[in-house]
């Protein structure tokens, strides 16, 4: 490989990348101005499309992007539409970090709603901190105690596989949760635990 061929290869990759982003931008434009209002009854919002294109520009330019927008502009769809299409077209992962679990769960619902509209089937993972999940060993110890024996229904739900605090209905009282949740997982601390994988 010659020295000059490195630059040609980089130029070819840049052209291919630009072509992918252009193709995604065409889909984004068609979605927000044609499909969303006509096929799905969603309101066309100029600020939403502007934000979607700004996100594509950030992806194309490989830079960080922060946006502040008022309530009702459609921020979730504005970043999910281009990023879901980007993931479909490139196969590359997309990470969206939020400040609250409630917003993460809203985004999960929005992705379920958008996926058939965009003809995408992304692999989506909702990541929360470990304290939001049951520690089987601590739960077993608690349910064996006199205090824990009064929570037979809760124990049964855990045995059936419910592990996420927000999935329990009715909600688990804080004083009970702090006795059954994962406090701090580490290989060393959990060494020998029959539930650790």
Show which residues each predicted segment covers:
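Walker A/P-loop NTP-binding motif
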Residues: 54-57, 76-90, 110-114
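N-terminal pre-P-loop "Q-motif" helix
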Residues: 42-59
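A substrate-engagement module of RecA-like helicase motors
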Residues: 2-39, 90-197
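Walker A/P-loop
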Residues: 61-81
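Short, surface-exposed connector motifs at secondary-structure boundaries
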Residues: 61-65, 88-95
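Alpha-helix capping and helix-loop boundary segments enriched in small/acidic/polar residues
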Residues: 42-46, 67-74, 98, 102
């Amino acid at each position: 490989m010659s020295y000059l061929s490195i630059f040609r290869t980089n130029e070819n990759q840049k052209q291919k990348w630009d072509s992918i982003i252009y193709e995604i931008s065409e889909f984004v434009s068609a979605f927000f101005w044609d499909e969303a209002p006509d096929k799905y009854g969603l309101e066309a919002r100029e600020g939403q499309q502007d934000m979607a294109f700004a996100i594509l520009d950030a992806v194309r330019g490989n830079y960080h992007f922060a946006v502040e927008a008022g309530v009702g502009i459609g921020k979730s769809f504005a970043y999910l539409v281009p990023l879901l299409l980007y993931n479909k077209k490139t196969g590359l992962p997309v990470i969206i970090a939020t400040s609250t679990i409630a917003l993460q769960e809203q985004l999960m619902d929005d992705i379920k709603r958008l996926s058939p509209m965009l003809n995408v089937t992304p692999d989506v993972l909702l990541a929360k901190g470990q304290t939001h999940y049951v520690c089987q060993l601590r739960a077993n110890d608690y349910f064996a105690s006199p205090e824990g024996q009064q929570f037979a229904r809760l124990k049964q739900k855990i045995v059936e596989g419910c592990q996420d605090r927000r999935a329990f209905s009715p909600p688990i009282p804080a004083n009970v949760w702090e006795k059954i949740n994962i406090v701090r997982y580490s290989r060393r601390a959990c060494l020998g635990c029959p539930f650790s994988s």
